[in-house]
Structure formats: C-alpha cells, structure tokens
Amino acid sequence: MKRRMILKVGVASLVALCLSVSSLSAKEAFNFPKDKQKALLLSSSGYKDTGYLNHALPWLKEFVEKNKLKGKKVAFIPYAGVRKSYDAYEAQVKKALESLGVEIISVHKGKAADIVKSADAIFVGGGNTFELVNQLYKNKLVELIAKRVSEGVPYVGWSAGSNVAGATMQTTNDMPIAEPESFNTFNIFPHQINPHFISGKPVGHNGESREERLEEFLILNPKSIIYALPEGVALLIDGKKVKVLGMDKKAPLLKLEHKKDISKIAIDSEFDY
C-alpha cells in the first residue's frame, strides 16, 4: 500500500512539474529577437464606407514594395472567419488585394505548417480571436509564425490578426466562442493590442465602456501596456521601431497603463518599444 501511495505521489509530482515547465516554456517560446521584424497591423478591414481593405491599400502597396513581395507567395490564415467558409474568406481577400501582385494561398488548402514554412509573407485575417487562436494552436502555428516573423518574414494582420500580433489575446473585444490552449500569441509587438477602439458609451448602454474593460485588464496585469487602435489606425513595425498610420489625425493611437492617464500618440509619429 505504501509503495502504491509513494508511486501515486511521485507520478502526481512529475505531472505537476511537467505542467509547470510546459507553462514556462509557452511564455518564453515566443520571445524571439525583434530586430528583423516587418509588420503592418491594421485596426480593421474597413474604414467608414470605403469597402473591404480599400482604405489600407496604399499602406499595403508600400509594404509589399518595400519588402519586395511582388509575385511572392503569401500564406493567409483564415481561422478567425467563423460566419463564412475558409474558401469564401480566401476568395474575398484575393479579390481585395489583387492589385498587390502577390500569390495568396490559404493555409487550409494543405498542411498549414508546410504552407507557412514555404511562404514569403504571412497575412492573418480578422474575425473571432478566440477561434483564431484556438485553430492556430491546434495546427501548431503560433510558435512557428512567431519564429518566421522574427527571421524577417513580413506579417500583415487586421482586426483579430492584429490582436494576436501582441503579447497575448487578452485585450480582444470578442466573445469566447472557443477555448484556446493558451492566451499567449505571437508577441511580435510585445505589448497588448486592442483593435476597433471606441471611446465612451452609446446612449442607453449600461455596461462597461471600452476604457473600463481595458482598465480591468490592467488592474489584474499592472505591468502590461495596452495600445488601443481606433478605426482607421495601423501600426507599421520595422524591427523595434513603430510608425503610427491613420486615416484621421483626430483619432490617434492610445496608450493605456495602470494608474496613469491615457496618453495619445499622434498619427505619423514614431516610437521605439
């Protein structure tokens, strides 16, 4: 009996140790070097009534040209698209970005990891962040994409695709319709990202404002920094430098920190992280 009890305790301790090491590894695994990173992170796929990704085409064209992606292969991640098929999502993105002159292939068309490994760039679409991260982990793409981007493979994300470029997905606006393995994401930009930021409360709304929701996160994670992107705002990342892009100079990037006033970062300004 004693031997069985010792064996059970030993196995339990070993399992606990493995879980502890696994958790630690998950946090450390995506902290790759940042010097070679090239990324364009859009708050959303649209701006007012300009159409799907139309407002971002000038930024995207410049990004493609600067990174010599014309005629190159782009791995598209469609996993956030819940209300449409992956085929339909791929077709929508191909049509919207036809003028870029890149070859877009969705990772659902084959073995996802192989498509990402052979791609010259990675584009991640918007939708539901929980399902996006859920599928990224199921297909073993989180660490792989983080590593490829650290090696200089250009990355473009919009909405959920921008949220997951941050340290974790915990400042998403989405419903938890799926349970991912972890909230840790690509950590390309080693802070929190909140896309689609809207200030205040609509008339008649008695729930929390976006500011209040983000404050809740900071209360529990006081060392974190959140960058909130209003509609029409984007982050252009080159190594450890960030340029703020935007459609409206009156709607700047916002920086939120624990027990500090919200600070505004002007459109067209640059900062190091």
Question: Residue ranges of each PLM-predicted region?
Answer:
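N-terminal export leaders
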Residues: 3-10
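Bacterial N-terminal signal peptides
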Residues: 12-20
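Boundary at the C-terminal end of the N-terminal hydrophobic targeting segment
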Residues: 24-26
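C-terminal and late-domain segments of enzyme folds
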Residues: 30-70, 81-91, 171, 175-273
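Portal/gating segments that form or line small-molecule/metal binding sites
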Residues: 75-127, 131-132, 137
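Alpha-helix C-terminal capping/helix-to-coil transition sites in glycosyltransferase folds
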Residues: 117-118, 151, 188
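Catalytic-core regions built around general acid/base machinery
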Residues: 139-152
